[in-house]
Amino acid sequence: MTLRLNRRDFVAGSALLAGTALALGPVRVEAATLAAPEIDRLTIRVLVDSGHELFLDKTDHPMVKVERSGIGIIGGSAALAGINSQWGLSLYIESTAAGVTRRQMLDFGLTPDVLVNNATLLGVDPATLDGLILSHGHGDHYGGLIGFIAKHRAALRPDIALVVGGEDNFCWQYVKKPDGKFTEFGVLDRADLKRLHVPWSTAEEPRLIGDQAISTGRIARESIEKVLPNTYVQYGMHDGAGCDAGHFTAAERQGEIVPNQHWHEHATCFNLRGRGLVVISSCGHAGIINSVKTAQKVTGINKVHAIIGGFHLYPAKADYVAEIVQGIKALDPDVVIPMHCSGVNFVAAAHEMMPDKLVTSTTGNRFTLGV
């Protein structure tokens, strides 16, 4: 089944709230690209991830309030409903500044049934959502989007908007089979967004999302990290969907299926008062160290409080993983919460090399920072 999202001219308005320059965070590294608003509190609920553990350690980290999820009960009745897990990621994020709370959904898992089920069980009210964010154009991050919007369009605010990383989000994606042939991995079809009256805008450059969240824009490739094997991409349009090939180089416009370098990927960040940067990397194809360093450069804030999300290290060999963990440790974050595609080798290496920073996560967990 092809996953599709919609064709829409660039909409800069509703999601591009260039906020007032507020007080900046702890330590500066250089002049900031944009002023990073301070927030007082950040809560992240994992709506979809690849596993659900009932018996993880419930002990809080000194810097994070950790809430583990059990079996859901709908409406207080005796009917039990399970939290579902699948390959993919979706996060429900609440940020609060000066008593004002903003609510964003970052990524949407692979299928709408799992996202809708889990969001309902975990108490997410679609009517309270201020915005939607897509980290990159992989089906396990946008697959639940259209179904979730269609299910809740009447409840969602009329001006709800989607922020994506770049034009590449809308390119056709492919997976190479063992026999060397390609099979479709889906496409974001902008026609669906148009049908559901959801405008979209890009974050190819650093920008604010609403008045509390920050997008890194395109992530600079400056560390030892490399894009590990994943999917393939085709630049151009066919069957009424795809990406505008005029946006790319002459070589990319040849229409060949090539390895995806994820130039469109961006990270979502927050400036937590008195603590520093919280960097959320949904998949980290561009490199988790690169993502953090780009966030530092964009905001001018050196202190990293938390690194959260998918780091795409599950295909990596142990020595490479250890090198990346050492690089993360050198950034001196207070907290590291790996999810999704980070991989068991990363968790094991982090537990060995920086156990005081590691917090584990599964579907349904909620983490509160700034408590």
Task: Please name every model-derived segment.
Residues 166-195:
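Active-site neighborhood of divalent metal-dependent phosphoester bond hydrolases
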Residues 208-268, 274:
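Active-site-proximal loop/helix segment associated with metal-binding centers of metalloenzymes
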Residues 1-18:
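N-terminal secretory signal peptides and thylakoid transit peptides that target proteins
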Residues 51-53, 58, 65-122, 261, ...:
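Conserved beta-strand hairpin/beta-sheet module of binuclear metal-dependent hydrolase folds
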Residues 24-45:
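C-terminal segment of N-terminal export signals and the immediately downstream linker at the start
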Residues 113-164, 299-308:
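Active-site metal-binding motif and surrounding structural segment of the metallo-beta-lactamase
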Residues 93, 119, 136, 212, ...:
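Divalent metal-coordination and catalytic microenvironments
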Residues 131, 138-142, 161, 247-367:
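Cap/insert and terminal regions of metallo-dependent hydrolase folds
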